[in-house]
């Protein structure tokens, strides 16, 4: 998901963009996607299972790192390969249920780099659609976007894929791999400590 603070902005209410507030009441537009890397993770787990069958020790960080970095060596058009990563429905694109699908023609460049690149691009596809609504239709301007979550654990890869998708620079903190749980912990700490300060 991508959340943008709307300081002094007015925005039309849209059913595809979640309007929420921060603990201090600031308005935030949130592009929330239900799928992101869920389908990609399923494929990575398939590679993990194959590696286990060969009797090779499995280190998930190494598997992700090698596959993600290898994706960057693929064709920029993913060799024609297309991934529809919908494990579940997606409100931003109006789909009630998901059915993941991988599509290629006989003439496409079907190799591991293009396969992984197609899945990485698919993982941010809904974020791109939602952000196009904010940036192009609503004319929202942003100062910075910070990426977080498992997609950003492999240095530079998720950052580069998302930056290309939404045509914006992406910053990533050292704790980026902690994802939503990190943010939830910070929010919980804020709520607890803020209550103590008010009492």
What are these regions (language model features)?
Residues 3, 9-146, 151-199:
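Active-site core segments that coordinate phosphate-bearing ligands/cofactors
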């Amino acid at each position: 998901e991508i959340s943008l603070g709307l300081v002094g902005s007015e925005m039309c209410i849209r059913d595809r963009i979640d309007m929420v507030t921060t603990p201090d009441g600031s308005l935030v537009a949130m592009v929330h996607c239900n799928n992101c890397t869920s389908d990609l993770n399923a494929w990575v787990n398939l590679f993990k299972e194959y590696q286990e069958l060969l009797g090779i020790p499995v280190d998930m960080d190494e598997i992700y790192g090698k596959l993600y970095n290898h994706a960057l060596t693929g064709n920029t058009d993913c060799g024609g390969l297309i991934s529809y990563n919908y494990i579940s429905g997606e409100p931003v694109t109006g789909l009630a249920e998901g059915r993941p699908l991988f599509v290629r023609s006989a003439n496409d460049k079907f190799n591991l780099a293009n396969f992984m690149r197609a899945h990485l691009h698919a993982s941010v596809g809904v974020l791109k659609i939602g952000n196009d609504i904010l940036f192009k239709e609503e004319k929202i301007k942003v100062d910075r976007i910070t990426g977080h979550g498992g997609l950003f654990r492999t240095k530079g890869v998720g950052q580069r894929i998302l930056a290309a998708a939404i045509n914006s620079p992406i910053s990533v903190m050292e704790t980026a791999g902690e994802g939503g749980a990190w943010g939830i912990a910070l929010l919980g700490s804020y709520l607890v400590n803020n209550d103590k300060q008010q009492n």
